[in-house]
Amino acid sequence: MAHKKGVGSSKNGRESHSKRLGVKIFGGEACKAGNIIIRQRGTEFHPGENIGMGKDHTLFALVDGTVKFKVGREDRRYVSIIPAEATEA
């Protein structure tokens, strides 16, 4: 039996980098058009009013305003933006 392992065998180095997923701007916080609200895999949250969805299911603001989370039918979670003009009045 060899007392040392052969050169080149490595058990480490397979850990993938974290993808920094999750909510970036929370309910009640102000945001600007284009701000990323949520990064996600699949539609854990669905786009509501004034929210766009990227091809990787990222939700982003289409207008300036305040973020609002709500639960719809069958526990489907939605994110919406209440426009800044509506919140000022």
Curated annotation (Swiss-Prot):
Gene Ontology process terms (BP): translation
SUPFAM superfamilies, per database record: Ribosomal L27 protein-like
Gene3D superfamilies, per the entry: 2.40.50.100
Annotated keywords: Ribonucleoprotein, Ribosomal protein
UniProt key word Ribonucleoprotein: yes
InterPro entries in alphabetical order: Ribosomal_bL27, Ribosomal_bL27_CS
Domain of life: Bacteria
Molecular functions (GO terms): structural constituent of ribosome
A GO term from the CC aspect: cytosolic large ribosomal subunit
Keyword Transmembrane in record: no
NCBIfam families registered for this protein in UniProt: L27
Family statement: Belongs to the bacterial ribosomal protein bL27 family.
UniProt name for this protein: Large ribosomal subunit protein bL27
Organismal lineage: Bacteria, Pseudomonadati, Bacteroidota, Bacteroidia, Bacteroidales
Gene that specifies this protein: rpmA
